[in-house]
């Protein structure tokens, strides 16, 4: 899989120059390229490349913000997805003093890419005013704008600027999410679930309040609530498990937990297997956890879901899973004793140690 930063390549730069010149014939290509400084391009991250383009546009477009914004609004429809986040980034960097024009531009840009990161400084500047705007966007006809209402207000948006006030008190976000609880777009519903999951990490009582009000009212809301509870479910929260019908696992026996190999080299995979038996009909959520050794020798547990299923009285089910120990950009592996645990309905049923070397 190609590195995401390669989206910002020479072809994109050429296309950007072409489309900007179509709207602004006086655009100085040479000055733009000089300020872009492509000689160190390979070393730059995705965000650094995007920001370099944003700054170079600022140095080359008209200094009047509204005039430059008009050119960018003409250009933006030609750039979809991550390639288009440079346009909201321009607003984020240079548009805070031009609230009305910037908000209209972000509404437009998000329909081709996403303005979720660019709205964060506006929340920091005037949270009450921006929350009101996000609430208005929650009723927009375009699903990308409705998603922006939720995604932009997430207390813990990945890659996004932190909003300390919403981390401390996320309740202002709830009216926005309530507008979207039955949204017809899965794209929007995923964002709502992610927002509520963010909230649950520090304010689980607020998620419970939403669940009490909405769970069981519509298939869309049930889907949102279930996905919003994923962190609490992984933590084995008893109230969360009970909400979805997972009772205690006293009647479940787990047998023959084994893993191969017992000594695993970084880059290889661990295979483990076990079987379960139930003394009664029951709904089960089966997970496994690995206590990974970290860089300084401390351990950090990560929980992975295996399945959610029903098991009948006197039924036996077997499971085999493979866990890769190949280094990823999101996880680096270290040598040492690791622990594998199997969890059923929030209860650890068995564990074993293995060596990573």
Swiss-Prot record:
This is Uncharacterized protein YhaZ. It comes from Bacillus subtilis (strain 168). HEAT repeats lie at residues 173-211. Pfam families: DNA_alkylation (PF08713). InterPro entries: ARM-type_fold (IPR016024), DNA_alkylation (IPR014825), HEAT_type_2 (IPR021133). The gene is yhaZ. Induction: By mitomycin C and UV irradiation which requires RecA.
């Amino acid at each position: 899989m190609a590195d995401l930063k390669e989206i910002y390549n020479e072809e994109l730069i050429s296309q950007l120059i072409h489309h900007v010149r179509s709207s602004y014939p006086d655009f100085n290509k040479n000055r733009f390229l000089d300020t872009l400084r492509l000689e160190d391009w390979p070393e730059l991250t995705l965000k650094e490349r995007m920001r370099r383009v944003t700054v170079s546009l600022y140095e080359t477009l008209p200094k009047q913000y509204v005039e430059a914004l008009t050119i960018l609004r003409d250009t933006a429809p030609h750039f979809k997805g991550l390639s288009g986040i440079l346009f909201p980034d321009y607003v984020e960097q240079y548009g805070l003093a031009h609230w009305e024009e910037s908000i209209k531009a972000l509404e437009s840009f998000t329909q081709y890419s996403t303005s979720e990161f660019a709205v964060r400084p506006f929340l920091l500047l005037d949270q009450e005013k921006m929350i009101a705007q996000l609430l208005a966007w929650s009723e927009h006809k375009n699903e990308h704008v409705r998603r922006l209402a939720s995604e932009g207000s997430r207390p813990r948006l990945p890659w996004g600027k932190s909003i300390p006030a919403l981390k401390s008190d996320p309740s202002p976000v709830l009216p926005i999410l309530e507008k979207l609880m039955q949204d017809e777009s899965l794209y929007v519903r995923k964002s709502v679930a992610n927002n509520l999951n963010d909230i649950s990490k520090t304010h689980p009582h607020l998620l419970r309040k939403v669940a009490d009000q909405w769970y069981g009212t519509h298939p869309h809301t049930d889907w949102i609530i279930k996905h919003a509870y994923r962190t609490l479910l992984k933590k084995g929260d008893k109230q969360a498990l009970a909400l979805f019908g997972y009772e205690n696992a006293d009647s479940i026996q787990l047998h023959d937990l084994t893993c191969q190999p017992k000594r695993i080299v970084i880059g290889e995979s661990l295979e483990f297997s076990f079987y379960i038996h139930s003394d009664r009909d029951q709904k089960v959520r089966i997970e496994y956890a690995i206590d990974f050794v970290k860089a300084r020798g401390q351990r950090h547990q990560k929980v992975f879901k295996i399945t959610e299923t029903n098991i009948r009285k006197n039924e036996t089910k077997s499971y085999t899973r493979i866990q890769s120990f190949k280094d990823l950009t999101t996880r680096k592996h270290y040598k040492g004793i690791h622990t594998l645990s199997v969890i059923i309905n929030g209860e650890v049923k068995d564990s074993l140690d293995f060596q990573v070397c």
